[in-house]
């Protein structure tokens, strides 16, 4: 996708190392275009958010790879039996290992992806981890959108359009939940699974309150 070959967007440099180019190629090879542009926006928004907080991102390459690959677990070739964040993190770490990234940096990428849906945790860790969390949160939920200047937002969306992201991403989440309903229990996607009619052992996906009430304790 030629959009990914831009040198910079909204004042954020797009890394063009061999590893970053390989990450783009991996993303493009099996992901729908709306997901590709989401991952690219995640990097731009996350970079701007971390910059505004004054936090450092020491490893730009690792941050870019984590942002680009953070939703791999939703794509059929990388789905296993875990919640999608873990499946995606595992796939990204395999990618890093294949490209001879050090174990420490591969672990950083893994954590950034595994924790990208963990409010209150990701922002307390390394800048690379916070970047993916903040960027994904802004693009998915609009968290911090009011802090993005209109001209900056316009440039980002011109370069990386949303392509009906909300509806298409929800459909992808539903498909993931239907593939593996057990992995959604006690995660933020459990309500998506319930609304989609997913069942576990013939019963609706339980809530946290139901699980606690059913625990084998008298009190």
What are these regions (language model features)?
Residues 1-10, 28-36, 40, 44-56, ...:
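Divalent metal-dependent phosphate-bond-processing catalytic cores, especially two-metal-ion Mg2+/Mn2+ enzymes
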Residues 16-17:
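Low-complexity intrinsically disordered segments
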Residues 26, 30, 49, 72-75, ...:
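Alpha-helix C-capping/helix-to-loop hinge sites
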Residues 37, 58-60, 83, 87, ...:
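Alpha-helix N-cap and coil->helix boundary residues
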Residues 41-44, 83-98:
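An active-site-proximal "capping" alpha-helix that borders the catalytic cofactor pocket
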Residues 59-78, 84, 88, 92, ...:
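His-Asp-centered metal-binding catalytic motifs of divalent-metal-dependent phosphohydrolases/nucleases
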Residues 93, 98-109, 122:
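Internal catalytic or translocation cores that form aromatic/hydrophobic pockets or channels
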